[in-house]
């Protein structure tokens, strides 16, 4: 889907730019030290845009100091009180996220739009299924994809009527199929970049599955310019999942893909532990390769040869395979160090 280019800090989204990975801090924003520490961890994991909640003037004031210590654009998340938006903009937020429907009167929305316009920072218009207006619920006989889209476009038109079009849209639902349908409907009705995610998707286990299904169905249609995998847990897990989803869909390169067999009665090494340790090992390598971890000598060598680098287990030992060729036979406890050495000197 062709969308217009929007600048968020030093990051461009839309218009064919790479899909940006976002997350949101779960610290108290006014706790600058804790918030910065978390953002730096997220940056290291691959986060490209960060959102922070701004429920108080203290949180808004903290944005100025936080931005001095981080390296990615910061989005201020605003609900209900338009003064928080004004303060966040004043303190250097790179983008603000609002739902004009809960900000208050048109005059208050205009004040926010005017402040954003003065600094030329984008506004993300966010609508969730849980905040759908009663008239739209009555019109469509419940919370529906059609109602979510109409709500979002109404708010976009409100801001356009105030003379501003530096906008991003997000429409979210915890209902995966409703969320997918809403994005399909919206994509044909707007040129603004879309921030995509399944809201309130759950814990790392359930949330990853729901997000992978929903985001894949949306992104595979060419819809979406930024994404967030919303999880109940450490936000760093959101980044890991988002990167894997994009890589799996062929929308992003870089980062090592680990494949491993599901184990069976033929498994001859502690494969579950080894595969887990390999996944942890490769997190910080920027290599665009595939690493295979296989548990037995029946299928292991053949399947590992399809990867760039791999191990195939035997009884207390294993084979190290590179570019399809067996290069070493090692005791089990030496497989991981040998794998690391190959990665450190990859060619």
Language model features: what each stretch is:
Residues 57-78, 111-123, 183-194, 278-280:
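Alpha-helix-loop-beta-strand connector modules within alpha/beta enzyme cores
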Residues 83-124:
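Hydrophobic or amphipathic alpha-helical targeting/insertion segments
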Residues 26, 31-32, 43-66, 97-105, ...:
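Glycine-rich, proline-tolerant flexible connector loops at the mouths of alpha/beta enzymes
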């Amino acid at each position: 889907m062709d969308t217009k280019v929007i600048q968020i800090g030093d990051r461009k989204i839309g218009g064919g730019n790479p899909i940006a990975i976002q997350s949101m801090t779960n610290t108290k924003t006014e706790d600058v030290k804790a918030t910065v520490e978390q953002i730096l961890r997220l940056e290291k994991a691959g986060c490209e845009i960060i959102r922070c909640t701004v429920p108080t003037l203290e949180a808004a004031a903290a944005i100025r100091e936080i931005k001095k210590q981080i390296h990615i654009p910061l989005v201020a998340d605003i609900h209900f009180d338009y003064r928080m938006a004004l303060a966040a903009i004043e303190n250097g937020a790179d983008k603000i996220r609002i739902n004009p429907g809960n900000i208050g009167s048109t005059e208050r929305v205009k004040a926010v739009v005017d402040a954003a316009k003065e600094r030329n920072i984008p506004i993300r218009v966010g609508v969730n299924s849980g905040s759908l207006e009663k008239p739209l619920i009555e019109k469509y006989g419940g919370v529906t994809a059609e109602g979510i889209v109409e709500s979002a476009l109404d708010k976009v038109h409100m801001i356009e009527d105030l003379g501003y079009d530096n906008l991003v849209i997000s429409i979210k639902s915890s209902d995966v199929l409703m969320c997918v349908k809403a994005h399909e409907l919206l994509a044909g009705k707007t040129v603004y970049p879309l921030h995509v995610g399944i809201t309130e998707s759950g814990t790392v286990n359930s949330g990853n599955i729901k997000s992978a299904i929903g985001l894949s169905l949306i992104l595979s249609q060419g819809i979406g310019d930024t994404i967030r995998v919303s999880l109940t847990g450490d936000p760093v897990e959101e980044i890991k999942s988002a990167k894997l989803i994009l890589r799996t869909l062929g929308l992003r390169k870089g980062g090592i893909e680990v494949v491993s067999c599901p184990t069976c009665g033929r498994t001859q090494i502690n494969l579950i532990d080894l595969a887990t340790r390999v996944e942890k090992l490769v997190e910080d390598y920027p290599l665009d390769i595939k690493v295979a971890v296989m548990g037995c000598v029946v299928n292991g060598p053949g399947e590992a040869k399809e990867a760039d680098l791999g191990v195939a287990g035997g009884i207390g030992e294993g084979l190290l395979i590179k570019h399809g060729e067996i290069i070493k036979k090692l005791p089990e406890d030496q497989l991981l160090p040998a794998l690391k050495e190959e990665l450190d000197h990859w060619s």
